[in-house]
Amino acid sequence: VSVILESRGCKEGIQPLRSSRESAGTADGRCQDTGIEKSHAILIRKTLLTETSLIIHWCSREHGFIRTVAKGARRPGSPYAGKLDLFYTAELAWLPARKSDLHTLKELEVTDFRLGLQSSYLRVLCASYFVKLLEGVAEVETPVESLYDLLRRALDYLTSHEPTRKAVLHFERELAHDLGVHGDESAAPITSLRQMLHRMPVLREELWEQLTS
């Protein structure tokens, strides 16, 4: 599924989407003439910008947490219809903003819809908690490749499995290990994570109460 919006591309047009490291432009993933950035990313939130446009929040492999504007996404017949939903993975291209962290989405190709993840409230709740945890420990627009991979694996699991307390503890433990804050295997990983966060996501309490062991 490919969506193109007001895309100018390089001199000969935008090439098929590739990761930053495989870009036909510069080595850092920019199209040489336009400054277009490219990355694999997971859609983690969308908010209303105007009557016709959305702000899309992403967790990307190469650029960390970023925000893009999807212009005209809410217009009738928009090419974005059905292609901007929570926890989709996509290859995207955007034009970086010069004076803010709100960039302009230029091209989008969905690579994984994760339709099974939307099949239950608990799966969505658990996925949302995982996202909140990562947002609490990662800097905006800072590469978080290991955290991206952790989230991707967790979402893939939730696509075909209901969450359990064991699964949540596994995610928290993996995150704490990745951050280098979980040295005591006998202690709950959430204890280590609390040291890095000002406050734990409120979603955890609701999630924990509804989960089985």
Predicted features and spans:
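Intrinsic disorder/low-complexity segments
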Residues: 1-31
